[in-house]
């Protein structure tokens, strides 16, 4: 009987121990485990949100980069068109200025040529008159006429 009483005492002590553990130890342990599970779940969900936010930010950055590249290409294209336009305008302006200067130079050359011709005509007329006076002043003979004409030709 003593074994039965010991066994019954141990069983009763075990039941009291289990009841005390269930009443006083188990609830704080369960609360700590549940809090830890909640913290882990919150951490996982926040990591998932952060990953989604990162993917969204990467997508936005990629889109903005593509848009910036397109805008840069458009700006460069517009600048090249404007450069070509400015070069064409400068070429047309330079060509017009060149034609104007050439026309002015030609006009000056023509005026100078005309003035030189007029001066030359006056000199030729003066020489012809002087030669005619010399011929008329001398006797009319062939040798003298030929000599005077040769001198006039040499002067011209």
Swiss-Prot record:
It comes from the Bacteria. It is a single-pass membrane protein. It is found in: Cell inner membrane. Pfam families: ATP-synt_B. The chain crosses the membrane at residues 13-33. CDD domains: ATP-synt_Fo_b. GO terms for cellular component: plasma membrane; proton-transporting ATP synthase complex. InterPro entries: ATP_synth_B-like_membr_sf, ATP_synth_b/b'su_bac/chlpt, ATP_synth_F0_bsu_bac, ATP_synthase_B_chain. Its main location: membrane. The keyword Repeat does not apply. GO terms for molecular function: proton-transporting ATP synthase activity, rotational mechanism; proton-transporting ATPase activity, rotational mechanism. Keywords: ATP synthesis, Cell inner membrane, Cell membrane, CF(0), Hydrogen ion transport, Ion transport, Membrane, Transmembrane, Transmembrane helix, Transport. Belongs to the ATPase B chain family. F-type ATPases have 2 components, F(1) - the catalytic core - and F(0) - the membrane proton channel. F(1) has five subunits: alpha(3), beta(3), gamma(1), delta(1), epsilon(1). F(0) has three main subunits: a(1), b(2) and c(10-14). The alpha and beta chains form an alternating ring which encloses part of the gamma chain. F(1) is attached to F(0) by a central stalk formed by the gamma and epsilon chains, while a peripheral stalk is formed by the delta and b chains. HAMAP family: ATP_synth_b_bprime (MF_01398). F(1)F(0) ATP synthase produces ATP from ADP in the presence of a proton or sodium gradient. F-type ATPases consist of two structural domains, F(1) containing the extramembraneous catalytic core and F(0) containing the membrane proton channel, linked together by a central stalk and a peripheral stalk. During catalysis, ATP synthesis in the catalytic domain of F(1) is coupled via a rotary mechanism of the central stalk subunits to proton translocation. Component of the F(0) channel, it forms part of the peripheral stalk, linking F(1) to F(0). This is ATP synthase subunit b. It comes from Aeromonas salmonicida (strain A449).
């Amino acid at each position: 009987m003593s074994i039965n009483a010991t066994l019954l005492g141990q069983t009763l002590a075990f039941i009291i121990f289990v009841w005390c553990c269930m009443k006083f130890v188990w609830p704080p342990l369960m609360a700590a485990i549940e809090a830890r599970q909640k913290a882990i779940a919150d951490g996982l969900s926040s990591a998932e949100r952060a990953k989604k936010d990162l993917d969204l930010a990467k997508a936005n950055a990629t889109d903005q980069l593509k848009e910036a590249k397109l805008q840069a290409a458009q700006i460069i294209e517009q600048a090249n068109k404007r450069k070509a336009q400015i070069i064409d305008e400068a070429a047309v302006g330079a060509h017009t200025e060149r034609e104007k200067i050439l026309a002015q130079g030609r006009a000056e050359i023509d005026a100078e040529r005309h003035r030189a011709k007029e001066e030359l005509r006056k000199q030729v007329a003066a020489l012809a008159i002087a030669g005619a006076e010399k011929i008329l002043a001398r006797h009319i003979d062939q040798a003298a006429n030929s000599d005077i004409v040769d001198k006039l030709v040499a002067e011209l």
